Amino acid sequence: YEVLGWGGYWAWDPVENVSFIPWLLATAFLHSSKAQLNESTLLNWNYFLGGIMFLSTIFGTFITRSGVLISVHAFSNGNIGIFLLTGLAFFTLFFLYAGSKNIKYFATSKKITHILGKSSFFIANNMLLFVSALIVFIGTVYPIFYETLYQRQLTIGRTFFDIMIGPLLLVLVFLMIFSTKISVKNLKFKKWITDNLKIVN
């Protein structure tokens, strides 16, 4: 079970990691999409998030099926890795092209004026989730570049991910608790502190 059961609970295996990255990005996208629907903000950020979320799913399939990383869950299947990498490159270029064609639309995005409003908490939520996804991505692909440059295998263990990701997710939990009591409009800082102290107590 420890080997075949996805690390027993969670072992930061490369294939586990690449399945975790789209989940983090999708969660961020769902939250920021609400800000776009309600207040017409974050248009360009949502386009960026939606694009890399889709690309991360192709990347995850590439890692799983190409055999470029050692994992108990990875399995290669002929030359499918080349096709997946080609598809990843194609959709990346398409994503950049479509974005460049819609610059005027992104410019219509409204600025966030409520410092202690829900949109600000959505941004903080997004930053934590995005940075977490970025750290997981770097920790997962770094061994590939290390082996290419130095011809030596490198494994990044769960200690790295626990130390780097744990505090971010802990802050995220606190934001989730407080943001449920935040109104859409701006609040006075003193009232915001008082309301959230009541929640903690």
For each feature predicted by the language model, list its residue ranges.
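Membrane-interfacial alpha-helical segments at the cytosolic side of multi-pass membrane proteins
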Residues: 21-34
